[in-house]
Amino acid sequence: MNPMEEVIIDKVVVNIGVGQAGDRLTKAAKVLEMLTGHKATNTLAKKSIRDFNIRKRLPIGVKVTLRKKDAMEFLQKAFYVKDYKITDYSFDKHGNAYFGISDYTDFKGMKYDPDIGIFGMDVAIVFRRRGGYRIERRRIGSKTIPNSIRVRKEEAQDFLQKNFKVTVVR
């Protein structure tokens, strides 16, 4: 295989959606910082929802984006929590994978803190090939990448099976 066609992990995004600003948001940020070692950033509401008392651009969640070595280390911990299993429908047609973790205390070494409470999180894994993706991101002469070059669902599943010993449950 051409080394530029090799599938790699572009990034891992860990998100906790709190649904409200305030004290719970800072506690969720603290949980993400304990798990990943990186500072969490706020996610903002896209539109106002009167019934939930949410205004547009109000911080309602926190997220951390991990790349390279940090992403691989976090995925080892996350797949341990999921018993090294991921469902087939967790992958989209471009090979990206998404799964949820119901409680942060499931991670190794994490204990329940009554001051923080219980928080679950969503994990998104974005795959790409080693070469060719700059074409889509560059400022001048940017083009869309054809589907033949994009990472397919089966390739992403093979990558996780080889590198993390994850079984894909169909």
Swiss-Prot record:
Record bears the keyword Ribonucleoprotein: yes
Highest taxon above the source species: Archaea
A Pfam family recorded for this sequence: Ribosomal_L5_C
SUPFAM superfamilies: RL5-like
Keywords in alphabetical order: Ribonucleoprotein, Ribosomal protein, RNA-binding, rRNA-binding, tRNA-binding
Residue pairs linked by disulfide bridges in the UniProt entry: none
InterPro entries tied to this protein: Ribosomal_uL5, Ribosomal_uL5_arc, Ribosomal_uL5_C, Ribosomal_uL5_dom_sf, Ribosomal_uL5_N
GO cellular component entries: ribonucleoprotein complex; ribosome
GO molecular function: rRNA binding; structural constituent of ribosome; tRNA binding
Family named by the database record: Belongs to the universal ribosomal protein uL5 family.
Functional description taken from the UniProt entry: This is one of the proteins that bind and probably mediate the attachment of the 5S RNA into the large ribosomal subunit, where it forms part of the central protuberance. In the 70S ribosome it contacts protein S13 of the 30S subunit (bridge B1b), connecting the 2 subunits; this bridge is implicated in subunit movement. May contact the P site tRNA; the 5S rRNA and some of its associated proteins might help stabilize positioning of ribosome-bound tRNAs.
Description of how the protein assembles with itself and partners: Part of the 50S ribosomal subunit; contacts the 5S rRNA and probably tRNA. Forms a bridge to the 30S subunit in the 70S ribosome.
NCBIfam families referenced in this protein's UniProt entry, alphabetically: PRK04219.1
HAMAP family referenced in this protein's UniProt entry, alphabetically: Ribosomal_uL5_A
Name of the protein in question: Large ribosomal subunit protein uL5
Organism this protein belongs to: Thermoplasma acidophilum (strain ATCC 25905 / DSM 1728 / JCM 9062 / NBRC 15155 / AMRC-C165)
